[in-house]
Amino acid sequence: MKTHKSLSTLLVVAFALAPQLLNTSPRALAASGGTYSARLISPTIGQVLHPGQQVRIQWKDSLPNVRYVAWCEMEVWLSLDGGRTFTMCITPILAPKTTYFDWTVPNAPTNAAVLDVRFGCDGWYPESYSPQAASTFVIAQN
C-alpha cells in the first residue's frame, strides 16, 4: 500500500513539473536556441505557373537549435487567397533540413497564391509558420 501512495505522489509531482519542462513561450524558445524563419527562393513574386507544370519550391531557412531533430518535420502549405487561409498541404512530411520540394501545380487558378513553409518538433518545438506573403505568385487558368 505504501508503494501505491509513493507512486501516486511521484506522478502528481511529475505532472506538476511537466509544463515547466515544455515551456514554448517566445522568450524560452529564444533562450534555448532561437526561433524558426524561412525565406522563399522559388517560385518568385509574380511568377505565372500553369496547372500540371512541375515546379521546384525552394527556400532558405533558419532552424532553431533543437535537441531531438529526428522528431522535427517540415511542411509546405498553399493559400489561394493571398495568405488569409492555408487549406492545402502540398508536401508530405519532410525532414527538417529539407530546403526544396518538386511540386505539380494544381488546377486551382488564382492571382494570389502564397506558400507557408512550416516547421515543428513533437514535444520539443511548437509548429511554427512562415507565410511568404511577399512572394505572391499566379496559378493560371488551364
Model-derived features with residue positions:
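Extended, solvent-exposed regions of the mature portions of secreted/cell-surface glycoproteins
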Residues: 29-142
